[in-house]
From Swiss-Prot:
The gene is Vdac3. The modification Phosphoserine is found at S241. Disruption phenotype: Male Vdac3-deficient mice are infertile as a result of reduced sperm mobility due to an abnormal mitochondrial sheat in spermatozoa. GO terms for biological process: behavioral fear response; chemical synaptic transmission; learning; neuron-neuron synaptic transmission; sperm mitochondrial sheath assembly; spermatogenesis. This is Non-selective voltage-gated ion channel VDAC3. It comes from Mus musculus. The modification N6-acetyllysine is found at K12, K15, K20, K90, K266.
C-alpha cells in the first residue's frame, strides 16, 4: 500500500470542497470514453462568456499493464503537442518513472521533464528535472507520515543561477473525517486549511492565507451538501464578499450537469456577476 500523499496533494480534501462543482464565467464540456482495445479518450472544451474565447484539448491514454507502462498523448487548440511515457511498480512497488515532453509546431519549441516518485505507507518523495542543457531546474519534494501527522518539504533549484528558487514547508494532520493543513512558501506566504466531513452528506472547509509585510489576509469558508445520490449543492464565500453557488445533477449514469454562479456581494446591484454551465459525459 502507498497511502502517503504527494506534496501537491496535501490539503487536497479542503481544496476540492472549494474548487469542485464550480465553473464561473464559462461553458464547459468534458467527454470521456474507452475503446474496446483499452485506449482511453478524453476531450474538453470551454468558452469564456466574458471574452467569447474558446479552447479545447484532447488526450489519449493507453496502458500496457503487464509491463507497467502508460502512454499518454495530448493536444490543445494552442497547437501544443504533449507526449508522456510512465513506468510504474516494476522496478519497485510504489516507484514511478516518467518522461514528459512538449512540442509546439508553430515555433519549433521543445521542452521536457524527467520525473521520478516513490510512495510508501510512511513516506513519499519525488523529483523532476527539466531537460534544458542551458541549465536545468531541479524540483524535489518529500512527505513523511506518522500516525496521521504529515510533514512535507518542496524545493526547486535553478542550476543556471545556482540558487534555490522555491523553498516550501507544510505540516498537517489527516484522519478519516478531519484534515488540517498548514504551509509556508519561501518564508513569506503563510496559509492553512481545515476539512471536516460532518456526515455522509455534508462536507465543510475553511482556508486562511496571508503574506508577510502585507495586510491582505484571505479567508474563506465552503460547504457541500448531498441531497441524494444524484444531486449536490455547493456554496462558498470569502472575505472579499464573493459568494459562489453550485448545483450538480447526475442526469443518468455517466451524464452530469453543473450550474454555478459567482455573486459580488459588495456590488450586488451593479452587476458583474458570473454564471457557468458544465456538462460531463462518460461512456
Amino acid at each position: 500500500m502507498c497511502n502517503t500523499p504527494t506534496y501537491c496533494d496535501l490539503g487536497k480534501a479542503a481544496k476540492d470542497v472549494f474548487n469542485k462543482g464550480y465553473g464561473f464565467g464559462m461553458v464547459k464540456i468534458d467527454l470521456k470514453t474507452k475503446s474496446c482495445s483499452g485506449v482511453e479518450f478524453s476531450t474538453s472544451g470551454h468558452a469564456y462568456t466574458d471574452t467569447g474565447k474558446a479552447s479545447g484539448n484532447l488526450e489519449t491514454k493507453y496502458k500496457v499493464c503487464n509491463y507497467g507502462l502508460t502512454f499518454t498523448q495530448k493536444w490543445n487548440t494552442d497547437n501544443t503537442l504533449g507526449t508522456e511515457i510512465s513506468w510504474e511498480n516494476k522496478l519497485a512497488e510504489g516507484l514511478k518513472l516518467t518522461l514528459d515532453t512538449i512540442f509546439v509546431p508553430n515555433t519549433g519549441k521543445k521542452s521536457g521533464k524527467l520525473k521520478a516518485s516513490y510512495r510508501r505507507d510512511c513516506f513519499s518523495l519525488g523529483s523532476n528535472v527539466d531537460i534544458d542543457f542551458s541549465g536545468p531546474t531541479i524540483y524535489g519534494w518529500a512527505v513523511l507520515a506518522f500516525e496521521g501527522w504529515l510533514a512535507g518539504y518542496q524545493m526547486s533549484f535553478d542550476t543556471a543561477k545556482s540558487k534555490l528558487s522555491q523553498n516550501n514547508f507544510a505540516l498537517g494532520y489527516k484522519a478519516a473525517d478531519f484534515q488540517l493543513h498548514t504551509h509556508v512558501n519561501d518564508g513569506t506566504e503563510f496559509g492553512g486549511s481545515i476539512y471536516q466531513k460532518v456526515n455522509e452528506r455534508i462536507e465543510t472547509s475553511i482556508n486562511l492565507a496571508w503574506t508577510a509585510g502585507s495586510n491582505n489576509t484571505r479567508f474563506g469558508i465552503a460547504a457541500k451538501y448531498k441531497l441524494d445520490c444524484r444531486t449536490s449543492l455547493s456554496a462558498k464565500v470569502n472575505n472579499a464578499s464573493l459568494i459562489g453557488l453550485g448545483y450538480t445533477q447526475t442526469l443518468r449514469p455517466g451524464v452530469k450537469l453543473t450550474l454555478s454562479a459567482l455573486i459580488d456581494g459588495k456590488n450586488f446591484n451593479a452587476g458583474g456577476h458570473k454564471v457557468g454551465l458544465g456538462f460531463e459525459l462518460e461512456a
